[in-house]
Amino acid sequence: MTHDNKLQVEAIKCGTVIDHIPAQIGFKLLTLFKLTATDQRITIGLNLPSGELGRKDLIKIENTFLTEQQANQLAMYAPKATVNRIDNYEVVRKLTLSLPDHIDGVLTCPNSNCISRSEPVSSSFSVKSRDGDVHLKCRYCEKEFEHQVVLQAD
C-alpha cells in the first residue's frame, strides 16, 4: 500500500512558517501581530487536517523572520504552535513557544477606564502563571485579568 502525500499549502524557499495554530485562530494572529504589514507573500492554510489538533491553521511568510520574542508572544493564542525558520526549502531552526514575561503593543486592556484605551500609549501586560492558569496584569491600570478575558477584548 502506498501513500501519496501532497502539500496542502505550497512550500516556501525562505521565511517563516507558523504551524500547529488552533483552527480559527490564524486570522486573529495575522491581525493582532500585524503579520500582513509586509509586501512579502503570505500563504494561509485554514482548517487543515492535523493528527494532534484535529484541525489546524498554518501561516507562511516569505523572506520574513520572527524574533524569538515575537514568536513567544504568539503563545498566548497558540501555545502549542511552532515557528520554523526556512532557508532553501529546509527547516533550519524550530522554535517551541513559551509564554513571555511581557506582551507589549498587541492586546487591549478590558478595563474601559484604563488610559491605554483613550491615550496614545501602547498596551503593556505582564504575564503571570498561577496553578496552570495564565493571568495578565495591565501596566497602566494595574488590574489583573484571566488571559481569556483579555483575549476576548480584542
Curated annotation (Swiss-Prot):
Q: Which InterPro entries match?
A: Asp_carbamoyltransf_reg_N, Asp_carbamoylTrfase_reg, Asp_carbamoyltrfase_reg_C, Asp_carbatrfase_reg_C_sf, Asp_carbatrfase_reg_N_sf
Which key words are in the record?
Metal-binding, Pyrimidine biosynthesis, Zinc
What's the protein here called?
A: Aspartate carbamoyltransferase regulatory chain
Q: What does this protein do?
A: Involved in allosteric regulation of aspartate carbamoyltransferase.
Family listed: Belongs to the PyrI family.
Q: How does it assemble?
A: Contains catalytic and regulatory chains.
Q: Does the keyword Aminoacyl-tRNA synthetase apply?
A: no
The cofactor(s) it depends on are: Zn(2+)
Organism of origin is: Serratia proteamaculans (strain 568)
What Gene Ontology molecular-function terms does this entry list? metal ion binding
